[in-house]
Amino acid sequence: MSEYLSVTSLTKYIKYKFDQDPHLQSVLIKGELSNFKKHSSGHLYFNVKDKNSVISAMMFKGNASKIDFEPKEGDEVLLEARVSVYERRGNYQIYVNKMHMDGIGNLYQKLEQLKKKLTKEGFFDQNHKKVIPKFPQKIAVLTAGTGAAIRDIHTTINSRYPLAEQVQINTLVQGEQAKSDIIEKINQADALNVDTIIIGRGGGSIEDLWNFNEEDVVKAIYNCQTPIISAVGHETDFTLSDFVADVRAATPTQAAVMATPDQYELRQYLQQANLSLTRFIKQYMQQKRKHLEHVASYYKFQTPSLLYDQQIQKRDDLEKQLKLSLNLKIKNQQQQLQLLFNNFNLKTFKQRIKRDQLTNNQKRVELSKVMHNLLDNQKNNLARKLENLNNLSPTNTMLRGYTIVNKDDKVITSTKDLAENDNIVLTMKDGVVDAQVKKVRCNDE
């Protein structure tokens, strides 16, 4: 007669088959989150679905804490998980190890999170922006060595302000190596003592422009001492490099316009300034000539002796008064000096010095006693605190028979943080024990 299996036995057998299948231990799944719930324990429970199917899923707290975004109902996600059977209900489900946003949505969310972080840290503050020089002598251009961007920048600068020397620094603007190359070239340009730096490239997708959203690139632009114009992408494209740069240009051509004055406008301005200056000088000379003619007509200038006769007499009177004043001052100083000399008593002065020395010695002894007493009190107080601290240390606590429980490198303080089959580490006074939870019993059960 055939032996009947219990439901539990059959379920355990099916679970065993799932757990032994290597293809089910690490699977990559793409789908939409539904029925998403975050338990008070920190574990996540949800379904993953597409148009035709639904799979139950859960994610333990330790793995959930590593998610780099805030998952919610309806998110399209990429999952790395293992497939197993939940014995209590007898259905299969996935246990998720890693979760990421699917595709471009992840990039936009990452961009927004980084923008908020850098804004909070002050990287985009206006008070950090540097002024672009009006008349640059040397401009560094950081972009790809070939393409429309470098051609437009060179053509525009040569047309507007050929006096400016252009330093072309070929830079990777796309690909895995671009981030480090952009940072290196920014530092290189900053060390060249140029007046302005233009960072530019043509348009592209968010993936193409992503190197200009990297935090390290933003910090390199922020720390650069040379004013920077960012011209990354087209007019509708925005990167974090645009926000941190001193000026943002919609296109590489506009960046070249912002970096230079227009030579034709300068010539027109200089011509106008020359006319205005010439007209001002003529008017000024006419005014001064009229004033000189008016002054020359005064009667004193017609008889020059009237200008200095009275001044000579006034000088003689002042010289006489000065001599009398000096003689009187010298006499008074001599009388005061003689009076001080007569009143000076050398013996009294020595006695006062000796008395002050005795007073100082007494105060020195008293101060030394106070300092020794204070130092002894501080030493005794420190010894008592060290003794109290030693009594409260975890090592002394374990010497009295207590054990510290850790799970996922975190100290467990409540049975509510544990579940059956959890792997835990017990730290005792003489070593460490790796253990597994068989059953959890709470005091309120």
From Swiss-Prot:
Write down the top EC class of this protein.
Answer: hydrolase
The places in or outside the cell where this protein is found are: Cytoplasm
Q: Name one GO cellular component term.
A: cytoplasm
Q: What is its main location?
A: cytoplasm
Q: Catalyses which reaction?
A: Exonucleolytic cleavage in either 5'- to 3'- or 3'- to 5'-direction to yield nucleoside 5'-phosphates
Q: Which Pfam families match?
A: Exonuc_VII_L (PF02601), tRNA_anti_2 (PF13742)
Q: Which domain of life is it from?
A: Bacteria
Give the UniProt keywords, A-Z.
Cytoplasm, Exonuclease, Hydrolase, Nuclease
What EC number(s) has UniProt assigned to this enzyme?
A: 3.1.11.6
Q: How does it assemble?
A: Heterooligomer composed of large and small subunits.
Question: What NCBIfam families does its record include?
Answer: xseA
Q: Which family does it belong to?
A: Belongs to the XseA family.
Put simply, this protein is called: Exodeoxyribonuclease 7 large subunit
Q: Give the species.
A: Staphylococcus saprophyticus subsp. saprophyticus (strain ATCC 15305 / DSM 20229 / NCIMB 8711 / NCTC 7292 / S-41)
Q: What is the lineage of its organism?
A: Bacteria, Bacillati, Bacillota, Bacilli, Bacillales
